[in-house]
Curated annotation (Swiss-Prot):
<dbReference type="GO" id="GO:0008270">
    <property type="term" value="F:zinc ion binding"/>
</dbReference>
<keyword id="KW-0805">Transcription regulation</keyword>
<keyword id="KW-0597">Phosphoprotein</keyword>
<dbReference type="GO" id="GO:0006355">
    <property type="term" value="P:regulation of DNA-templated transcription"/>
</dbReference>
<protein>
    <recommendedName>
        <fullName>SAGA-associated factor 11 homolog</fullName>
    </recommendedName>
</protein>
<dbReference type="GO" id="GO:0006325">
    <property type="term" value="P:chromatin organization"/>
</dbReference>
<dbReference type="InterPro" id="IPR051078">
    <property type="entry name" value="SGF11"/>
</dbReference>
<dbReference type="InterPro" id="IPR013246">
    <property type="entry name" value="SAGA_su_Sgf11"/>
</dbReference>
<keyword id="KW-0653">Protein transport</keyword>
<dbReference type="GO" id="GO:0003713">
    <property type="term" value="F:transcription coactivator activity"/>
</dbReference>
<keyword id="KW-0509">mRNA transport</keyword>
<dbReference type="GO" id="GO:0045893">
    <property type="term" value="P:positive regulation of DNA-templated transcription"/>
</dbReference>
<keyword id="KW-0811">Translocation</keyword>
<keyword id="KW-0963">Cytoplasm</keyword>
<feature type="region of interest" description="Disordered">
    <location>
        <begin position="1"/>
        <end position="22"/>
    </location>
</feature>
<feature type="modified residue" description="Phosphoserine">
    <location>
        <position position="172"/>
    </location>
</feature>
<keyword id="KW-0539">Nucleus</keyword>
């Protein structure tokens, strides 16, 4: 049975549109054909033909609708770009990028020298004076500068200093005492048999 021979029913709103019968109508007609054993082949063919016609008509309607609305190209999907194909050449990876090791050199922004990438960070620290050794030298320089400044302030008679600057440095006396005790022992730390 073709789509043209299928019985149709009117739409629910009475708009006059003809739609194919529902599945209940097909099943009811199939049950009538099964009642007689000699009509089993006809019933199976009817059911198969009805399902096939319904599927084909559905695909045709959907394709027609997509073509009229301009969305038929979306049904095909996105074509594969040639830029994303795998490359199978020697010394290249699958994306076509060379796998050979290149010497990576960086230009120092401070001195404009070419430096190997592995040595760039240590070079930049030394070049800009921000490395560990440079910071130690800078902190020593600041300490000596502060010491000279505070000695200069004390010698000029400036009384505007803080209480900490006016205090006596007790740590230097402790160092002297230790050195005096070591000289009493003649440089040895042994008790030499003396008891206290």
């Amino acid at each position: 049975m073709s789509a043209a021979n299928m019985p149709t029913t009117t739409g629910a709103q009475g708009s006059g549109n003809q739609v194919p019968t529902t599945s209940t109508t097909i099943v009811n007609h199939f049950r009538e054909l099964i009642k007689e054993p000699k009509n089993l082949d006809e019933a199976a063919n009817y059911l198969y033909q009805s399902l096939l016609d319904d599927a084909v008509v559905g695909i045709f309607n959907e394709t027609h609708h997509l073509r009229k609305s301009g969305n038929l190209a979306a049904l095909d999907g996105v074509p594969e770009d040639s830029t994303y194909r795998m490359c199978e050449m020697p010394n290249l990876d699958i994306f076509g990028i060379s796998t050979a090791k290149k010497p990576m050199d960086c230009t120092c922004p401070n001195c404009d020298r070419l430096v190997a990438a592995a040595r760039f960070a240590p070079h930049l620290e030394k070049c800009m004076g921000m490395g560990r050794i440079s910071s130690r030298i800078a902190s020593r320089r600041l300490a000596t500068k502060e010491g000279a400044t505070s000695a200069h302030l004390h010698s000029s008679g400036n009384t505007g200093g803080t209480d900490d600057e006016d205090d006596v440095d007790w740590s230097s006396d402790k160092r002297r005492k230790k050195s005096n005790q070591n000289s009493r022992n003649n440089g040895s730390k042994k008790n030499n048999g003396k008891t206290f």
